[in-house]
Design a protein with these regions (language model features):
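Bilobed periplasmic-binding protein-like "clamshell/Venus-flytrap" ligand-binding domains
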Residues: 1-14, 159-170, 247-248
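Long, aromatic- and glycine/proline-rich binding clefts that accommodate carbohydrate-like moieties
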Residues: 120, 167-220
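Non-transmembrane alpha-helical segments in soluble domains
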Residues: 24, 55-62, 85, 89, ...
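Extracytoplasmic/periplasmic substrate-recognition and gating elements
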Residues: 102, 108-173
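Short helices/loops that flank or line small-molecule/ion binding pockets
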Residues: 1, 79-97, 223, 230
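Glycine-centered hinge/linker elements that transmit conformational signals in sensory
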Residues: 40-77, 122
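Extracytoplasmic/periplasmic solute-binding protein
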Residues: 1-44
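Conserved C-terminal helix/tail region of periplasmic/extracytoplasmic solute-binding proteins
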Residues: 198-249
Length: 249
C-alpha cells in the first residue's frame, strides 16, 4: 500500500524541533492539560513513564520503515522544508504530513489547496475523553509604557473588527480564537477551516518546547529527538533530557 507519512526533522542549527511538536500534540491527546503543564515546567520529570510512552508512540511510525517515506533513517536527515514534497510527487511518496499552518509556503509552486492537497485536525482519542485539544504558537502583546491611548489600542486589538482586517489580508496567516469574528472575512477557505479548528478547541496550549528553558526546549529536547529517531531508546533520550533539566536547577 501507500506510505502514510513524510517526516523531516532537519532545520540547520535547529534540527529536531519538528519532533518536539509531535511530542506536544501526543501529550495533549493522551493526558489532561494539567499533566502537559507539569511536563513543560518539569514538575513532572521528563523521564516520567507517560513522556516515554508518548515518545514511543511517535516512534511507532517515525521509526518504522513501512510508515515513513525514505525509511526511518531519513527522518532525522530530511529538511522539514523539503519533507512535504513527497506529497506531490508522481506517484506520491506519502499520503500525510504533519506541520503548522505555515507549511504551504514550502509546497511546490502552483499547487492549490482543496485540489492538490487538503488538511484535517490532528485527531483526538475517542477513548480518552479529552475533548479537542489544540497546540499552537502566537504573538503576545504587552504594555511597556502605560497610557490611556495604549490601553485603548490593546482593547481594539481584541475587537472582532481589528481581527477581521487582518483576516482579510491574503496570505496573512492570521488565526484568532475570538468567537465573535466573522469567518467569512478570511481570505480563503483554507484559513476559514484552520480558524474553525481553533474555535472548536476545548483546550489550547502553547508550544511546550518554546515554554521550556532554552537549554532544554531549544537544546537537549531538539537533539534528543534526533537521537531517538536515529536509534536510541525513548528512556535513554528522556533520561538525558531530564539530566539537562537537573543541570540548570
Amino acid at each position: 500500500g501507500n506510505t502514510p507519512w513524510c517526516i523531516g526533522l532537519g532545520s540547520g542549527d535547529a534540527t529536531g524541533w519538528p519532533a518536539t511538536d509531535w511530542m506536544e500534540d501526543i501529550m495533549l491527546r493522551t493526558h489532561k492539560p494539567a499533566v502537559y503543564d507539569q511536563w513543560v515546567t518539569n514538575e513532572m520529570p521528563f523521564n516520567d513513564k507517560r513522556v516515554i510512552e508518548a515518545m514511543d508512540f511517535f516512534g511507532s511510525f517515525a521509526k518504522n520503515d513501512k510508515y515513513v517515506s525514505g525509511g526511518s533513517k531519513a527522518v532525522a536527515t530530511t529538511d522539514f522544508r523539503d519533507s512535504p514534497k513527497g506529497l506531490f510527487s508522481s506517484p506520491p511518496k506519502c499520503m500525510m504530513h504533519r506541520q503548522a499552518s505555515f507549511i504551504p509556503a514550502f509546497f511546490p509552486e502552483g499547487v492549490k489547496a482543496g485540489q492538490d492537497y487538503d488538511f484535517f485536525y490532528f485527531p483526538s482519542y475517542s477513548t480518552k475523553d479529552l475533548g479537542n485539544p489544540v497546540l499552537g504558537g502566537g504573538t503576545l502583546f504587552a504594555i511597556t509604557k502605560d497610557s490611556k491611548a495604549t490601553r485603548e489600542f490593546l482593547n481594539y486589538l481584541g475587537h472582532p473588527q481589528s481581527n477581521e482586517i487582518w483576516m482579510a489580508i491574503d496570505g496573512s496567516g492570521f488565526l484568532n480564537p475570538n468567537k465573535l469574528i466573522d469567518l467569512s472575512k478570511h481570505s480563503s477557505d483554507t484559513f476559514r477551516g484552520l480558524n474553525q479548528i481553533l474555535l472548536n478547541a476545548t483546550t489550547f496550549r502553547f508550544d511546550g518546547s518554546d515554554l521550556m528553558p532554552g537549554a532544554i526546549g531549544a537544546g537537549s529536547f531538539w537533539t534528543g529527538m534526533v537521537d531517538y529517531t536515529s536509534g536510541k531508546s525513548a528512556k535513554e533520550v528522556a533520561d538525558k533530557i531530564q539530566a539537562s533539566w537537573d543541570a540548570i536547577k
